Amino acid sequence: MSDTEDLAALNDRLMAKNHALAEALNRAGKELTKAKSRLAQLAQPPLTFATMVKVDSTRTDADGIQHASAEVISGTRRMVVPVASNVNAARLTAGATVMLNEKLVLVEQRDADTVGQIRSVKQVLDDGRLIVTDASGNPVLIRRSGALAYADINQGDRIIVDPSVRLAIEALPAEGDKDLVLEETPDVTFADIGGLDSEIGRIRDAVQLPFRHRALFERYDLKPPKGVLLYGPPGNGKTMIAKAVANALCEGGYDSNGDGSISPAETRVKGVFLSVKGPELLNKYVGESERLIRLIFQRARERAADGNPVVVFIDEMDSLLRTRGSGVSSDVETTIVPQFLSELDGVESLDNVMVIGASNRVDMIDPAVLRPGRLDVKIRVGRPKTNQAIAIVDHYLTDDLPLENGVDAHALSAVLVHDIYGTSERRHLCDVQEENGQWHALFLADVVSGAMLKNIVDRAKTRAVKESIETGSDVALTVPLLAAAVEDEYRETRDSMADVDPEQWSRINGMDPIRRIRTAE
């Protein structure tokens, strides 16, 4: 190979090397540019969030450049800051979130924050300002943001406030007291309740008569009762009775003549049933329980304003209206009871509103609540007697169930009840010692309830279902199946007696005070 050819080959190699170096330098330059961009981004000072209050001043110079300042709140600092010329000051709205640069210049406006502290509106002033309270009841006077300038805000509404608690940012939907006050039409009727004819008659007289025969009540200058108390041991139908009353009220169009017709003078009315969860009204924050009670009665008055009857049903009333001074660690009842009584007896009329309370422990309810003129009618819903128990069981043992041949449902009910109410040793639960020191035997019949009767029938039905699955055909409900269900209930009840507190158990079950319990072997 000649020298010329060698030089040409070397030149080619050097040119290729130069191209590679140029590409490498180009790539390095791009990477360096990216790195500088990243460094520049990292070197940018942080922006500070603030809440816009109002435009403090604004003017435009001869060159058309805007010179404006704005009042903002950042944390707890209240400041007047300059507004960047590229931000239109006319579009800055109170309550909006704005950004401040390192020199505290307003450089950007964003939407108002959708999270923050929640306050309750205590009062709306004539100029639109709001007095709001926190969970402890501490009042604060605040302004409205631009978004709420013309919003309809009422006492009791909830709002979101800015971090400094100076501006109302957003109005929230009405507080979820619907979880506490359930407006409903229950599907339970008086026909679904067995063995409580006397109690049902009394409560119908107390609740339905005043609304069925308004003219007669006015003619005799008779005021309907303000309230009814259903009390007695648990599981015997207090809540079912209240639901049946609600069902009758909500359906309207009562049978006032007893023959399915409505007299010409009768006014057809349709009622409202407000169910209150008593224990959930209790709140650890001062004044909150009282506020909820006010809301409940306010809602009742609103529903009753058009003349329709309203029933406010308070279950577990003893948990809410406990005797004042009986608290162990606190005495919240000292303010809750007076608030309830003021709503019941207060200046604002409770026309067409009736309170129905249910309690297992009437001895724990404040005596002021129980006096005449408040809860006028007191109905004890006690344990069922034999005939009442049969009537209850008849609702759950019906002729359309698979029964053994030649036996009707009523006969099975009678056999079941007589087994439960037997006083032989096989139904002996325990011996109890009264306060006078005397011992006496306690049988299953002494603690029976409507709920227990239903549970026994359900046990028998469950056993029949299991046997039907095993055999592949319907297994009839028989006396032995029912007897086995009674035996299971008896054993569970007997075993549970060993772990109860005698004094507390006797009070809950509406019995005379018991000092000791000696379980059966």
UniProtKB/Swiss-Prot annotation:
GO cellular component term of the entry, any: proteasome complex
Cross-referenced InterPro entries: AAA+_ATPase, AAA_ATPase_domain, ATPase_AAA_core, ATPase_AAA_CS, NA-bd_OB-fold, P-loop_NTPase, Prot_ATP_ID_OB_2nd, Prot_ATP_ID_OB_N
Keywords for the protein's UniProt record, in alphabetical order: ATP-binding, Coiled coil, Nucleotide-binding
Superkingdom, taxonomy of origin: Bacteria
Positions in coiled-coil regions: 4-44
Pfam families cross-referenced by the UniProt entry: AAA, Prot_ATP_ID_OB_C, Prot_ATP_ID_OB_N
A molecular-function term among this protein's GO annotations: ATP hydrolysis activity
GO biological process: modification-dependent protein catabolic process; proteasomal protein catabolic process
Keyword Manganese applies: no
Coiled coil recorded as keyword: yes
UniProt binding sites for ATP: G235, N236, G237, K238, T239, M240
Record's subunit section: Homohexamer. Assembles into a hexameric ring structure.
HAMAP family, per database record: ARC_ATPase
Family affiliation: Belongs to the AAA ATPase family.
Name of the protein in question: AAA ATPase forming ring-shaped complexes
